[in-house]
Amino acid sequence: MKYSPILFISLALSGLYGQCDSAYTYYSQLPSNVTILIGDSCLYDEDITVLDSLIAINNLEYDSPLELGTQTWFNGRLRFLVAGNYGNSSGVNDTIFTLPNNIGNWTEMASLYLEWNRISQLPESFTEMAGLQSFYINNNVLVTLPDSIGTLESLYFLDLGYNQIESIPESICSLSALTYLWVFNNNLEQLPDCFCEMNMDWNDDDNGGYPFFA
């Protein structure tokens, strides 16, 4: 039996796109800022949707959500995102002012970099990012933190330096995995009573020789 070239192409494409589960979309071309650690180019739709929302709410100019910042994907899920406003190609091409309400759908996100933007608050859904291990949001304009921040059980590195935070929720003491908390240069007026019970050496400096508080 002879097959036409069009049929061969159709069969090839159906086999290619058929590799993705229903919640994923296959991307035939990936920009240079995207790294696939493990897996193929089937990327989780909800992760892409959050990127789209981040672009839209801040009027960022990208032709594709995959162009935002530096992205690392693991088995189809977004695991690392560098979206700091560094003035170079590793971060975003303009300032982020607002985080979308659906950011909590990044449940597999492990490391998120948002330094040098103008973010003033974190959505309540932020604490639904159950896989978050390290979060860098220094040099923004944060005033408060979500009361439920203590639910981020995997978080071990939290950089809040150079913001305008006036108080820290008591729930932060529930972060049993936390080993690094940088709150240098904020407007802190008081600290939770449980702070001294956290598994951290408050008398030490960070690796750069800077104190945790100032």
Annotate the PLM regions.
Residues 99-104, 122-125, 145-148, 168-171, ...:
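The feature encodes a structural signal of leucine-rich repeats
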Residues 96-101, 105-108, 113-117:
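Glycine-rich active-site/cofactor-binding loop and its immediate structural neighborhood
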Residues 94, 117, 137-140, 160-163, ...:
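Consensus "Asn ladder" position of solenoid repeat domains
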Residues 3-16:
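Sec-dependent N-terminal signal peptides
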Residues 15-102, 197-199, 209-210:
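N-terminal capping/linker segments that flank leucine-rich repeat
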Residues 79-84, 110-114, 133-137, 155-160, ...:
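Conserved hydrophobic beta-strand positions in leucine-rich repeat
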